[in-house]
Amino acid sequence: MLKYAIDFAKKPEKYFLKLDKNINLNNISYDKKLLKKAYYFSFDRHLNQVRDSGEPFSSHPYAVANILVNLKLDYQSIITALLHDTIEDGVATNEEIKKSFGTEINQLVEGVTKLSKIQLPNTEIREASNFSKFILAICEDIRILIIKLADRLHNMRTLNYIKEESRKFKIAKETLEVYAPLAGRVGFQVMREELEELAFKVTDAQAFQSIYKRILFLRKHNVDFISKNVLNLKNIVKSNYVKEITGREKRAYSTWKKMLKKSIALEKISDIYAFRIITHSKEDCYKVLGIIHTKWSMIPDRFKDFISTPKPNGYQSIHTT
């Protein structure tokens, strides 16, 4: 970490070129001149600030910008990520941002700043859910929320550098109750899962370690399980129905939720793998489901049809075990 901190501080051009390359790899149209201006504006204004990790503070907005690039957001959002802490930290004004980067980016930066100032009340999860709805309602531009989620994700990735345990726990709890559900609501399921996992490590470290050890044990005894079964599924399912088949290992937090919901002991947990089949149409999805159920028997209480009844955020799929 120290080596990276020194390198980032001494070679800002090197990291700008990395960001520029990442944007091009993701085929995002952008104003390179404005991007470079924002990058160095952030670097210069945060020059005297240091994060808990010992890194230059400007490495944080840089990391947030890269998260947004990987999500393929527009260049205005990426520039906003580079500038998102400047007003809040008092190193720039609205007028400066507006004059240098335009009205749209200034409004986005101002929106993220306002969102950062809203504090989660000391309430239970039920009320935290209402708070999530409140945040969604006040975000006039959904990009403001996505930038804030990326900001929280990077802060969670570096949470272990915070020495004060009570502060660390508060951030993790807030992430689990508010920001992870928000990520799910706007369709970023991978981000939601990572936020949950990072928060769970802090809010219940003992439970996390126990479950993670179980996952490692099952992983050790199921070498190449995912790749073998992806190949198996490809051989079973007709290719003209399917666009993509992938597999993944479930995370500790989702396993923990299942244990609580179904009152299952840790030793009984065996299904730590999930497979996703993306089809060309809804009709193809049901055809593939029929093929799968012909090969393997369905567990009745584990079937969910989110095509006929989509989730509130528009999510549509079929889940089966």
Place the predicted regions along the sequence by residue.
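Short, solvent-exposed alpha-helical surface patches in well-structured domains
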Residues: 34-37, 108, 170, 287
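Active-site alpha-helix of zinc metalloproteases
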Residues: 76, 80, 84
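Hydrophobic or amphipathic alpha-helical targeting/insertion segments
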Residues: 84-89, 93-111, 164, 188
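Hydrophobic packing positions in regular secondary-structure scaffolds
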Residues: 76-77, 99, 106-110, 120, ...
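Aromatic/histidine-rich interaction motifs
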Residues: 114
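Nucleic-acid processing machinery
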Residues: 1-29, 43-51, 58-71, 79, ...
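Short, mixed-charge amphipathic alpha-helical segments
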Residues: 22-38, 94-104
